[in-house]
């Protein structure tokens, strides 16, 4: 009897050990493959077609510089407009950006940029940062440094943030009165003014380098102004009348204090 009990106990222990081994062994592998996350694909540029139409329109209006056209095609204008105007980002007209200011008509941006005849390595001053779009266009042309001044504090801050976000490291934004230029970094190889004073500001002429180019609209507010291109040749300023344009007024203490003054237009 004892022998039978011993045999039964032994069989029970062996069964228990077998159960322990089964529970601690590796889990059974499933043959079903896990569902993989979808691989992200490159989004189609939603503005590509509109931008191409705009570039063709700018070309038809007379802009021929291939480098300028390339840059106009690559700088994302929709990043520089207010959200309520996104649908018009690549239409060929100015748009409000707040504070009584506008982002210029793309054709005007391209034309004025072409007039500067920029070469790689040149230093450029922009008066009237606005949204920062014109400064981005200038920087994309390969200029080493772009200096830009905006009188409206809120716009200067917004432009700085936007340009940094888009990776423009060679654009320096200053909040201040553009009438007096940026003498600490003068002379400049090119100066572009995106608001219209009623005269040619003398400080900007003084900050132009030899062979430097200055593109600026000049004229009374509320009327058609004249776009001028000035070139410094052997210390003398030569001016070229390029026809009628319409810009927002050049504001600030400097323009008001010197209203009707400035350098005589040659």
Model-predicted segments: where are they?
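Positively charged n-region of N-terminal signal peptides that target proteins for export
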Residues: 1-6
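C-terminal motif of bacterial Sec signal peptides marking the signal peptidase cleavage site
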Residues: 13-16
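Class I SAM-dependent transferase core
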Residues: 19-125, 134-137, 141, 155-158, ...
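Conserved nucleotide-cofactor-binding alpha/beta core module
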Residues: 117-238, 265
């Amino acid at each position: 009897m004892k022998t039978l009990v011993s045999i039964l106990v032994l069989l029970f222990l062996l069964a228990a050990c077998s159960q322990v081994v089964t529970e601690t062994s590796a889990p059974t592998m499933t043959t079903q493959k896990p569902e993989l996350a979808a691989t992200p694909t490159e989004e189609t540029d939603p503005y590509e077609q509109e931008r191409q139409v705009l570039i063709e329109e700018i070309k038809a209006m007379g802009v021929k510089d291939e480098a300028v056209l390339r840059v106009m095609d690559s700088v994302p204008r929709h990043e520089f407009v207010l959200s309520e105007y996104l649908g018009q980002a690549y239409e060929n007209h100015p748009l409000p950006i707040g504070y009584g200011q506008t982002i210029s008509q793309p054709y005007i941006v391209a034309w004025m940029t072409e007039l500067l005849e920029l070469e790689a390595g040149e230093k450029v001053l922009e008066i009237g940062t606005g949204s920062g779009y014109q400064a981005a266009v200038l920087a994309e042309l390969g200029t080493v440094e772009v200096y830009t001044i905006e009188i409206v504090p809120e716009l200067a801050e917004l432009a700085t943030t936007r340009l940094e976000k888009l990776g423009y490291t060679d654009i320096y934004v200053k909040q201040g009165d553009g009438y007096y230029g940026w003498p600490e970094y003068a002379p400049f190889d090119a100066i572009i003014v995106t608001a219209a004073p009623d005269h040619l500001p003398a400080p900007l002429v003084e900050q132009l380098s030899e062979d430097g180019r200055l593109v600026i609209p000049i004229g009374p507010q509320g009327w058609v102004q004249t776009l001028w291109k000035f070139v410094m040749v052997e210390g003398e300023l030569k001016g070229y009348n390029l026809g009628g344009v319409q810009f927002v007024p050049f504001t600030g203490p400097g323009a008001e204090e010197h209203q009707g003054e400035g350098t005589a237009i040659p």
